[in-house]
């Protein structure tokens, strides 16, 4: 299996013609509700015959969109990729009505939400190893 590594000089075109179509063909989008009204938005990319799971944890004031390239690389290498968006980020629930703010009552909320999604991944993929990949706050 050959994975195309995107070139900086042609990045936008390769994202549009290689990465995005591939992810669209293997991806699903869903919400998990840990507490009433608190829906965690998650992207899930499942390649043919995955051998393990990788949980991607994005950084502060980021969202799943920014991680399409790394999700592509992991999926092409046979990983089932889960990419939940933390509270206050992307399409996940917020603790304030102002969508321009990322407000959190307790940092443990990020940890507990991420564990909740990871348990779902474990249930959906019995016997598979689960790896964590985080960036910055993630």
Label every model-predicted segment.
Residues 51, 58-62:
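Active-site glycine-rich loops that stabilize anionic/oxyanionic intermediates
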Residues 51-54, 129:
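Alpha/beta-hydrolase fold active-site loops
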Residues 38, 63:
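Donor nucleotide-sugar binding loop of glycosyltransferases
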Residues 125-136:
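Alpha/beta-hydrolase fold nucleophile elbow
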